[in-house]
Structure formats: structure tokens, C-alpha cells
A protein has these predicted regions:
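Collagen triple-helix signature
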Residues: 1-154, 163, 185-215
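Extended, small-residue-rich solenoid/repeat segments and analogous flexible loops
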Residues: 155-191
Length: 215
């Protein structure tokens, strides 16, 4: 309906397209007008040349909801792994979606997807991890204007106020992270690529779980 409801998950890309490139994953569906989270993007397909790109996460409702996670890039056997899909945009209250992980390749791993940016209250999404084969991590999203923590691998801010906000939250989070293994506000860490490690738990108050590491 117009007021609420989560967006649907995007379809996974096909195994091959012309030229041996994996198909791109479908985009996650957008949520209802006011409430609901965006759907996750579909994973890119396997390619004998390049892996397919992960689909972007859907956008949340305008008031409350988180952006959908970007789909993971597909495995590229001969050349490059697929690029992870971008995380979706949240509502006024909600977290930006995590970028998808880059696809693996014996030649060049795909780059991780870009994390979604917070709006008012909420964290930026984590940048997706780079694929095995020296893929680069995606750029993390910036937190909401009023409250939130930047996502993993977010760019350094040029705003002194934003930098102060991030430093204060990091100090507040430290004892919670040490004692409980998760922050008060913030996202969990991404699992290391190639280890199959679980993503870290999100913050006690709010935060995305980190992306799981590839096997």
C-alpha cells in the first residue's frame, strides 16, 4: 500500500549473457510511501569472463525504514568479479543499506558496493567488502544529520561538527563493544572475505549487521 510495506527482493542475475559476462542482479523494490524498508538487490550472475554486477537495494519509505542491501557481485572466472550493488536510501529515521560484496575472481576481484547515506537519524550503510582477488572495499555511507554513525569505509568528513559527533559516538560505543561485542549505535563489522566469517551484530539501539564474509 502507499503508507507502508517492505519492497520486494530483486531477482538474481542469470549465469551468462553475451560475451561470457554474468547477468546483473535485479534492483530491490522500493517500500511504501511513508513506512517500510527497501528490498535487497539480487546477486550478480557467474560469468566465464566477468561476473555480473549486484543489483542496488531499494529505497525505504520517506518517514521510517532502512534502505535495502545491495546484492553481491557475481564470480568472474576469466577476468573480473562483479561489482557489489549500492545500498538503498533510508527514510528520515532508518539506516542506509549496506553495499553488496564484490565478486571473487582469480584475476581481479570486484569492488564492493557503496553504502547508503543516512538522512536524519540513522547510520550510513557499510561499504561492501572487495571480492577475493584484490577487490577494493566500497565507500561507506555517511550517517544521518542528527544522530548516527558512518558506515564502514566512509570518507573522512570535512565538517568539524560531524567529526565531533562521530568521535563522541565512538567513545560511547567503546565500553559496549568491549563488554558485549556490539556497539550501542553503529553497524557491525563486515566478515573478512575468504573466511566465511559472520558479519558483526549491529548496535543495541540501531545499526545494520555487517556483511558476512565470502567462503
Amino acid at each position: 500500500g502507499a503508507a507502508g510495506g517492505a519492497g520486494g527482493i530483486g531477482g538474481d542475475g542469470g549465469t551468462l549473457t553475451a560475451g561470457g559476462i554474468g547477468g546483473a542482479g535485479g534492483a530491490g523494490g522500493n517500500a511504501g510511501l511513508l513506512f517500510g524498508s527497501g528490498g535487497s538487490g539480487g546477486a550478480g550472475g557467474f560469468g566465464f569472463a566477468d561476473g555480473g554486477q549486484g543489483g542496488p537495494g531499494g529505497n525505504a519509505g520517506t518517514v521510517f525504514g532502512s534502505g535495502g542491501a545491495g546484492g553481491n557481485g557475481g564470480v568472474g572466472q576469466g577476468f573480473a568479479g562483479g561489482i557489489g550493488g549500492a545500498g538503498g536510501t533510508p527514510g528520515l529515521i532508518g539506516n542506509g543499506g549496506n553495499g553488496g560484496n564484490g565478486g571473487a575472481s582469480a584475476v581481479t576481484g570486484g569492488n564492493g558496493g557503496i553504502g547508503g547515506t543516512g538522512v536524519l537519524i540513522g547510520n550510513g550503510g557499510n561499504g561492501g567488502s572487495g571480492g577475493i582477488g584484490a577487490g577494493k572495499a566500497g565507500v561507506g555511507g555517511v550517517s544521518g544529520l542528527l544522530l548516527g554513525l558512518d558506515g564502514f569505509n566512509a570518507p573522512a568528513s570535512t565538517s568539524p561538527l560531524h567529526t565531533l559527533q562521530q568521535n563522541v559516538l565512538n567513545v560511547v560505543n567503546e565500553p559496549f563493544q568491549t563488554l558485549t561485542g556490539r556497539p550501542l549505535i553503529g553497524n557491525g563489522a563486515n566478515g573478512t572475505p575468504g573466511t566465511g566469517a559472520d558479519g558483526g551484530a549491529g548496535g543495541w539501539l540501531f545499526g545494520n549487521g555487517g556483511n558476512g564474509g565470502s567462503g
